[in-house]
């Protein structure tokens, strides 16, 4: 009878350790996924900034500005060029 109780308690302790380790691994995996998402989002924003300048972004010529924007000659920032097409 004592051995059955001992085996049961040992099994429960082992199960608790395995579940705890699994939970820690799950938390680490979740942290890595969140970090990857944040890094990807940051890289995407930087890529957009490199491709073209948004509204009121600094520029030196029309080619620096995004679609439907033009470089204002006096203030050197991107403004709307008056077009609506997609």
Swiss-Prot record:
Pfam family of the protein (one): Toxin_12
GO CC annotations, alphabetized: extracellular region
Cited SUPFAM superfamilies: omega toxin-like
Keyword Protease set for record: no
Predominant place of localization: secreted
PROSITE patterns the UniProt entry points to: HWTX_1
Signal peptide positions on this chain: 1-21
Disulfide feature: 52-66, 59-71, 65-78
Tissue: Expressed by the venom gland.
Subcellular location: Secreted
Propeptide: 22-50
Gene Ontology molecular function: ion channel inhibitor activity; toxin activity
InterPro entries the record matches: Huwentoxin-1 (IPR011696), Huwentoxin_CS1 (IPR013140)
Keywords per UniProt: Disulfide bond, Ion channel impairing toxin, Knottin, Secreted, Signal, Toxin
Domain notes: The presence of a 'disulfide through disulfide knot' structurally defines this protein as a knottin.
Known role: Ion channel inhibitor.
Family statement drawn from the similarity comment of this UniProt entry: Belongs to the neurotoxin 10 (Hwtx-1) family. 17 (Hntx-9) subfamily.
Official protein name in the record: Omega-theraphotoxin-Hhn1f 1
């Amino acid at each position: 009878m004592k051995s059955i109780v001992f085996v049961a308690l040992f099994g429960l302790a082992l199960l608790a350790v395995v579940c705890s380790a699994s939970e820690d691994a799950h938390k680490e995996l979740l942290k890595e996924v969140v970090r990857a998402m944040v890094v990807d989002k940051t890289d995407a924003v930087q890529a957009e900034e490199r491709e073209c300048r948004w509204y009121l972004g600094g520029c030196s010529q029309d080619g620096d500005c995004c679609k439907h924007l033009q470089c204002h000659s006096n203030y050197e920032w991107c403004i709307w060029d008056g077009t609506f097409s997609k």
